């Protein structure tokens, strides 16, 4: 369910059409995107837009109840992992609901992206900077 305004029409539309437990993936520039998945390609050049900026814009619009990340994200890119977890904690505080965080192996993560209604590609070049958001409800 949408919460605010977003300029990218494709991403805004996907968020507006999400039902409870539907998923979207926000990924770095290198994550393979399955042919059958809807691709929203925001990448312009390396680093633009960033993973974190895209997560912030998405969280401003989307109510989430679950997060899935690769186990490798914590150890290979700990600073960015911590930034993401800080945003998730802030989202929990703002909405007053707990958000489940699950870790799975990266290979399993890539397979799980097939369940997403859309995969949003950023210009991020930090290893494992990928997240799956599970849609919640605003009530």
Swiss-Prot record:
Pathway linked to the protein: Carbohydrate metabolism; D-ribose degradation; D-ribose 5-phosphate from beta-D-ribopyranose: step 1/2
Reaction(s) the record says it catalyses: beta-D-ribopyranose = beta-D-ribofuranose
Subcellular localization: Cytoplasm
Sorted UniProt keywords: Carbohydrate metabolism, Cytoplasm, Isomerase
GO BP terms, alphabetized: D-ribose catabolic process
Gene Ontology molecular functions: D-ribose pyranase activity; intramolecular lyase activity; monosaccharide binding
Family from the record: Belongs to the RbsD / FucU family. RbsD subfamily.
Subunit structure comment from the entry: Homodecamer.
Protein function: Catalyzes the interconversion of beta-pyran and beta-furan forms of D-ribose.
Protein name (record): D-ribose pyranase
């Amino acid at each position: 369910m949408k919460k605010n305004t977003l300029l990218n029409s494709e991403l805004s539309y996907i968020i507006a059409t999400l039902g409870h437990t539907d998923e979207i993936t926000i990924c770095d520039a290198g994550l393979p995107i399955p042919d059958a998945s809807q691709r929203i390609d925001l990448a312009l050049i390396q680093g633009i837009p960033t993973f974190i900026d895209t997560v912030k814009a998405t969280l401003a619009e989307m109510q989430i109840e679950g997060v899935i990340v690769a186990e490798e994200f914590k150890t290979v890119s700990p600073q960015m992992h911590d930034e993401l977890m800080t945003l998730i904690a802030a989202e929990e505080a703002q909405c007053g609901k707990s958000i489940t965080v699950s870790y799975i192996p990266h290979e399993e993560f890539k397979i799980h992206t097939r369940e997403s209604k859309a995969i949003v590609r950023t210009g991020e070049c930090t290893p494992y900077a990928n997240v799956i958001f599970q849609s919640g409800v605003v009530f």
